[in-house]
Regions:
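Short, well-structured N-terminal submotif of metal-dependent ribonuclease cores
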Residues: 1-38, 51-63, 120, 130-131
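Acidic, PIN/NYN-like endoribonuclease modules and their adjacent C-terminal/linker elements
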Residues: 2, 100-131
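Alpha-helix capping/helix-boundary segments
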Residues: 11, 42, 79, 99, ...
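Short, conserved active-site loop motifs that form the nucleotide-linked donor/cofactor pocket
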Residues: 34, 70-71, 109
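Acidic catalytic patch
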Residues: 64-89
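Donor nucleotide-sugar recognition loop
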Residues: 89-95
Length: 131
C-alpha cells in the first residue's frame, strides 16, 4: 500500500481545478496513495484570501476536495509542536510553515508542494509537484 499523501493549499486548488501545472508523476502518486490529506488550515487560508478579494471561491468549495476523496485533517497540538523542526522558515508564510509541520508530524507521509522554499529544504519526504 502506498504511503499517505499530504497536499498543500496550492496543490489542493490545482487538483480541484484540474490544473495542468501538476506533473504527471504527482498525479500518479496521488492516485495510488493509501490516503490523500489536506489541512483544515488550507481551508482557512483559502477563506481568508477569498475574504480579501484575492480569490473567488464557490460557496461550498470544501466539498470539491471531499468529493475527490481528499480528507481534511485538523491542526493538532502535535502539529503545533512540530513547528520548531523548521527554524529556517521563521520568516516564511505562517500557513505554509504550519501545513508543513502538520504533514511532518506523522510518519509515512509524503508532502506535495510547489513552494520553492519548502522544496529547497531538501527533506526526503517533500516532493516538488510542479512542472
Amino acid at each position: 500500500m502506498a504511503r499517505r499523501a499530504f497536499i498543500d493549499t496550492q496543490v489542493a486548488l490545482w487538483l480541484a481545478k484540474g490544473d495542468s501545472r501538476l506533473n504527471s508523476g504527482t498525479l500518479k502518486w496521488l492516485n495510488s496513495s493509501s490516503e490523500t490529506v489536506m489541512s483544515a488550515l488550507s481551508i482557512a487560508e483559502l477563506e481568508i484570501k477569498a475574504g480579501i478579494g484575492k480569490l473567488a471561491l464557490p460557496k461550498d468549495f470544501a466539498e470539491l476536495f471531499l468529493n475527490q476523496g481528499i480528507k481534511i485533517e485538523a491542526f493538532s497540538q502535535e502539529s503545533a509542536a512540530s513547528l520548531s523542526r523548521f527554524p529556517s522558515l521563521v520568516r516564511h508564510d505562517p500557513f505554509d510553515r504550519m501545513i508543513l509541520a502538520q504533514a511532518g508530524a506523522k510518519q509515512d507521509t509524503v508532502f506535495f508542494t510547489a513552494d520553492r522554499a519548502l522544496v529547497a529544504l531538501g527533506l526526503d519526504w517533500v516532493v516538488d509537484c510542479a512542472h
